[in-house]
């Protein structure tokens, strides 16, 4: 691989991924010889070489592959890790979820889905005073709830999540479906590597949104258990029973995750 900027980006990943990621980048070039060169000369998110940050999760630790659509379209928010908004720290406030969480619509709905899954909210009542009541309980010292988004990310990692996007970059002048199409060969290589791990069953593929669901066209995805849902941007995600059943046993809002 001749792109020095991509080699530098690999330094933020776990070394177990390096051969896979290099192979994946070669697949991108094979499909579109000039794509990476054009990208290198353009402005894109995430910045500071964080394009592969999700791959800090070691290859052999992956039990779930969660795929969203693309990075947040804001520099502070785009981290290279699916749905982990860099502009968010505190999860709670005195009146409910924090202002930062409420501004990040997908994250807000994911949090509410987790609260429903944990029995803290009912599907019919997920706004206003009931959320404020949960927030007050969550912030009590004896409650043992996570308090920050990095803690939520740590709990997801502890449960074996690889948090990817269908498109690894965001550019305002490139439609997200087109950007995602360019990265499909890369993701296919990643999934093949996960399917081929010796002595390990393929992880569960969790696809959120229409762009992520397009990965189902890849033959390799037939080897994976799958959980497919609408994008969390949609309010209906909060009531998605399949997602509640998937995430409920993980107790992701617990400060001491024992999974």
Annotate each predicted stretch with a short phrase.
Residues 174-176, 217-218, 238-241:
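Short conserved micro-motifs at the rims of enzyme active sites and ligand-binding pockets
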Residues 19, 71, 175-176, 202-203, ...:
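Proline-rich intrinsically disordered, low-complexity coils
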Residues 12-199, 213-214:
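A polyanion-binding, active-site-adjacent surface
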């Amino acid at each position: 691989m001749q792109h020095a900027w991509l080699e530098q980006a690999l330094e933020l990943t776990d070394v177990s991924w390096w051969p896979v990621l290099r192979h994946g980048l070669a697949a991108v070039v094979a499909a579109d010889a000039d794509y990476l060169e054009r990208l290198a000369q353009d402005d894109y998110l995430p910045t500071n070489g964080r394009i592969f940050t999700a791959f800090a999760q070691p290859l052999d630790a992956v039990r779930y592959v969660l795929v969203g659509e693309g990075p947040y379209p804001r520099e502070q928010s785009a981290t290279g890790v699916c749905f982990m908004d860099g502009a968010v720290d505190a999860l709670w406030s005195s009146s409910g979820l924090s202002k930062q969480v409420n501004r990040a619509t997908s994250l807000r709905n994911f949090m509410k889905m987790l609260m429903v899954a944990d029995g803290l909210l009912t599907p019919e009542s997920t706004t206003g005073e009931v959320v404020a009541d949960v927030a007050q309980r969550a912030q009590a010292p004896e409650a043992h709830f996570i308090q920050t988004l990095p803690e939520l990310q740590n709990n997801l990692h502890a449960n074996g999540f690889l948090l990817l996007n269908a498109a690894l970059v965001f550019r305002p002048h490139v439609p997200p479906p087109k950007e995602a199409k360019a990265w499909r060969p890369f993701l296919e290589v990643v999934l093949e590597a996960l399917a081929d791990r010796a002595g390990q069953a393929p992880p569960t593929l969790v696809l959120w949104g229409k762009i992520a669901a397009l990965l189902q066209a890849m033959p390799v995805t037939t080897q994976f258990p799958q959980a497919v849902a609408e994008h969390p941007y949609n309010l209906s995600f909060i009531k998605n029973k399949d997602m509640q059943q998937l995430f409920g046993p993980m107790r992701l809002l617990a400060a001491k995750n024992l999974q």
